[in-house]
Amino acid sequence: MPSVAMLSVIAASGLMQFDVQSMGAASKLDAQNSLGLQAETGKIVANREVEERARRSGLQSMTADELERILAKNKGGHDAAVARQLSGFELKERLSNSRLQALIKSAPGPKSRLTLLVLADVSVFLAPAATEEPIQAPPDLGQQRHMIALTVDYLGKTLEKLPNFYAKRTTVRYEGDIQKVSPKGAEAQGAPLWRRVGSSEVTVLYRDGKELVDPRGWETRSAHPEVGGLVTKGTFGPILSAVIVDASHGEIAWDRWERGNAGTLAVFRYTVPESQSHYSVAAGFAEQAGGYHGDVAIDPATGAILRLTVKADPLLGSSTVRADIMVEYGPVEIGGKIYTCPIRSVSITRGATKMLFDAMGDSVPSEMVTRLNDVNFGDYHVFRSESRILTTDGPALNR
């Protein structure tokens, strides 16, 4: 069985999942050749953010500066009213963490602070504000090709050297209000008020290239702590190889320089057509492969992938209209050595919770809901054959 990265949600219409299957060594070599040629010919990838916004429900777009002015105008206002107002907005640029913390301090209460957190999470799929990007000339095609080759080499060598390890995965789940959909398919324009619907903490094992959730941490509970709502899996490696391999059969091109925590990052934008995609969306018992797009931010000196977004293209007839994931990677210490591993992830999905039949007998959504997960990874440890994972809810796990 190939390794799988999955983004799934339990909804009224059934299980909706988003799979990425990893490729073999031969495909990775093909990716190196194909990606290099694409960088050399300089293919241009169209901006897909307009398409993404078409999936949303009439929210008003604004910059971080405009958001700051709205909060200043509502200083001392009623917390619930400010939260409701903020829920009607979406950012048109990524909100930096430092900017977010400053905005949170000016929020009147917990409801508006929660809404700001969600607004920031939703914005992680966007580019930063132009004023926050480095002023630096784009690399020439030869430099682009070299960086892509470094990335393919990184995937082929570095990931294979990762030790078996385990880490703590902490997930906070958010959900917007259910919104009615008109018989003509137009979504209600009312802003969904976000709320926190739960959280979970599990131990994740990475062993022999596969991701496993330690069951001993939840076996005494009535249900798996991550069952229900939106669940993300497979961010430790397979998703990286699969996206790069798929992109080698699609299009990839230079996008921008970006400031990272440890220096300047090189960002490439990619698109994968449905015919070459190993990404699928399943609703109930029906599974449908579809195209996807996103961007990948790499260290230009080493090729290490430090940030990745995957955004599903709209699927005709699917009850899921959005299913996206972002993963950030950073240096972590495992067994006395430094490795690049996931440190944070944001997943978002929007889909139908209730379906009706129209006059033609086709099923159409009558209610829609948006769900979002904010995930943090930490407490990494090397996993040896004699390791014992101690949990608070069950006995130690031996391997």
Range-by-range predicted roles:
Residues 17, 21, 32, 38, ...:
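Residue-identity detector for glutamine
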Residues 18, 29-32, 46, 207, ...:
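Intrinsic-disorder/low-complexity regions
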Residues 23-135:
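General marker for long, soluble alpha-helical cores
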Residues 126-292, 300-306, 311-325, 330-399:
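Structured extracytoplasmic
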